[in-house]
């Protein structure tokens, strides 16, 4: 049981466990905004309702800062937030969001870090992901996971 990230008529398909998908989104959150990424990492530590309530309160506090408000440098990034909090089981992102994520991670060297099943990985998961995201944008295809 796990996730599959792909797009219609794509030569790319990423299969992994939910932990790998969480790691992928954690790395994107860190690259997008350091403060938010640091907080997003604590989501894995939530076990009780009170943990989630505290997490949500702090997430709202961070996202209410000027850089996320109208006119701020990240004011048009609600789709990134939506991606980070979407269901692990099924979801999709638009070609425009694929391009945004590509732009966020394109210059990062992930040093062979993987998010797919290790037995299926060539150690270049993030390099392939960058190509996949750009391909989705160019072909106007939604990226989807299930």
Regions found by a protein language model. Give the residues of each.
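Acidic (Asp/Glu-rich) sequence patches and key acidic residues
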Residues: 1-146
């Amino acid at each position: 049981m796990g996730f599959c990230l792909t797009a219609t008529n794509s030569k790319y398909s990423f299969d992994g466990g939910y932990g790998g998908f969480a790691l992928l989104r954690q790395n994107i959150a860190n690259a997008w905004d350091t403060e938010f990424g640091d907080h997003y990492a604590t989501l894995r530590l939530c076990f009780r309702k009170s943990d989630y309530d505290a997490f949500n309160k702090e997430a709202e506090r961070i996202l209410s800062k000027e850089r996320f408000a109208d006119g701020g440098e990240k004011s048009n990034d609600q789709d990134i937030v939506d991606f980070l909090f979407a269901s692990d089981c099924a979801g999709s992102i638009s070609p425009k969001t694929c391009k945004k994520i590509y732009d966020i991670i394109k210059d990062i060297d992930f040093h062979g870090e993987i998010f797919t099943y290790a037995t299926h990985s060539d150690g270049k998961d993030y390099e392939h992901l960058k190509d996949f995201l750009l391909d989705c944008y160019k072909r106007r295809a939604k990226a989807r996971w299930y």
